[in-house]
């Protein structure tokens, strides 16, 4: 059962990012629980991005891989970042030059249609942490609080926006996946996180330790 959470829910002085139901690749997900839970369609590859974009600073989020309906394997979960708003042709996170996706099946990361050896595999029940450092252009990825490595990112889009979004999705047309995002409000879906990690910024509650110098993706976090 979930633990108790102090008052970190959205409030007039601090709103936490959710996933954006109006901005999806391939129009292929069902959103619920205030857009903190997404379920992708089994017939389409797709990803979905956060409601808030990041152009400077250091931000952390966690997402739980809740379930998948693949007949075999680990479910083809994908998680990472995208440099611009989703476009329908960009169906897979990492297919383009301006998005990066961590793949559950083999632990690789996908960028510019290339897979690179990276970390461990993951599947249902695992919590993946993303730490995006836009001061140093890096993305660190965690599995259940353990670092899987760091990816160097670049602003490569034509007339680059310099803004990035956290992104959740799947890589495959044979299964559907369910993600639950926690951008700092202290819940995965309807369940409060079971044990709060440390967070030096004091902004947001996460299952595992928020890396030093990072903060939640929220209105307060964007103005630190």
Regions found by a protein language model. Name each.
Residues 1-224:
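PRY/SPRY (B30.2) beta-sandwich protein-interaction domains
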């Amino acid at each position: 059962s979930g633990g108790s959470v102090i008052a970190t829910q959205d409030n007039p002085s601090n709103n936490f990012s959710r996933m954006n139901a109006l901005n999806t690749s391939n129009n292929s997900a069902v959103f619920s629980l205030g857009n903190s839970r997404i379920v992708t369609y089994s017939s389409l590859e797709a990803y979905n991005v956060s409601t808030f974009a990041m152009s400077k600073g250091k931000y952390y989020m966690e997402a739980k891989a809740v379930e998948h309906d693949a007949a075999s394997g680990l479910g083809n979960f994908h998680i990472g970042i995208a440099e611009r708003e989703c476009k329908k042709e960009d169906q897979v996170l990492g297919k383009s030059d301006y998005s990066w996706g961590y793949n559950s099946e083999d632990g690789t990361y996908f960028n510019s249609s290339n897979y690179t050896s990276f970390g461990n595999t993951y599947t249902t029940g695992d919590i993946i942490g993303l730490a995006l450092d836009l001061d140093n252009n890096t993305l660190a990825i965690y599995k259940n609080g353990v670092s899987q490595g760091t990816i160097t990112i670049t602003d490569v889009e034509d007339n680059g926006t310099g803004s990035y979004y956290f992104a959740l999705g799947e890589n495959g047309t044979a299964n559907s996946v369910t993600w639950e995002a926690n951008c700092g409000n202290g819940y995965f879906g309807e369940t409060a996180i079971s044990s709060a990690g440390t967070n030096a910024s004091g902004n947001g509650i996460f299952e595992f330790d928020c890396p030093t110098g990072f903060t939640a993706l929220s209105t307060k976090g964007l103005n630190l």
